[in-house]
Amino acid sequence: MSKQEMLSFSGIVEDLLPNAMFRVKLENGHIVTAHAAGKLRKNRIRVLQGDKVQVEMTPYDLTKGRITFRG
C-alpha cells in the first residue's frame, strides 16, 4: 500500500493500553486504537495521555491506526 492511500488525522491520546497501544480520539470525534510507528519507537519518543498526535490509517480499517507524529 502506498503512502498516498493512507488517511491522516489529528487527535488526542485518551488512554494508554497494554502492549504499547493507545486509544486516540480524533478531531472528528471517532475513537481509534493506535500503535507507535517504528521511528517513534526507535528514537524513544514517549507518547503520554493528553498528547496531541498525528495518526495514519488505512481506508480499509478505520478502527486501527499508527501514530506518526507527536506534538
From Swiss-Prot:
Record-linked InterPro entries: NA-bd_OB-fold (IPR012340), RNA-binding_domain_S1_IF1 (IPR006196), TIF_IF1 (IPR004368)
Glycosyltransferase in keyword set: no
Cross-referenced Pfam families: eIF-1a
GO cellular component, as recorded: cytosol
Primary residence: cytoplasm
Top-rank taxon: Bacteria
Localization annotation: Cytoplasm
Residues annotated as domain S1-like: 1-71
Record key words, sorted: Cytoplasm, Initiation factor, Protein biosynthesis, RNA-binding, rRNA-binding
GO molecular function (one): rRNA binding
Keyword Transcription on entry: no
Assembly mode: Component of the 30S ribosomal translation pre-initiation complex which assembles on the 30S ribosome in the order IF-2 and IF-3, IF-1 and N-formylmethionyl-tRNA(fMet); mRNA recruitment can occur at any time during PIC assembly.
Protein family membership: Belongs to the IF-1 family.
Its biological purpose: One of the essential components for the initiation of protein synthesis. Stabilizes the binding of IF-2 and IF-3 on the 30S subunit to which N-formylmethionyl-tRNA(fMet) subsequently binds. Helps modulate mRNA selection, yielding the 30S pre-initiation complex (PIC). Upon addition of the 50S ribosomal subunit IF-1, IF-2 and IF-3 are released leaving the mature 70S translation initiation complex.
PANTHER family: TRANSLATION INITIATION FACTOR IF-1, CHLOROPLASTIC
HAMAP family noted in UniProt: IF_1 (MF_00075)
Protein name per its UniProtKB record: Translation initiation factor IF-1
Organism (species): Pelagibacter ubique (strain HTCC1062)
